[in-house]
Amino acid sequence: MVRKRVIVHGRVQGVFFRDTTRRTAGSRDVHGWVRNNPDGSVEAVFEGSEEAVDAMVRFARDGPRGAMVEHVEVRDEEPEGLTAFRVT
């Protein structure tokens, strides 16, 4: 199991980024959370198999239709054993 924290910058709020991330994570058995930040970015934590988490990072780099991703920060973290994916 691996865990990555991503912060996505660009036009990423108001384009269903969080909901699409939640649905995509659910289809890949990835746990964690996603939230809007006050600075206009979207932040997420993904936990799961290396392959599934890498797929989520690739998704974050593209975003849903309507998003304009400019930059993505990715940081490895220690897994915490999360059991669900939530939008906060």
Task: Annotate the PLM regions.
Residues 1-88:
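Intrinsically disordered, low-complexity, mixed-charge
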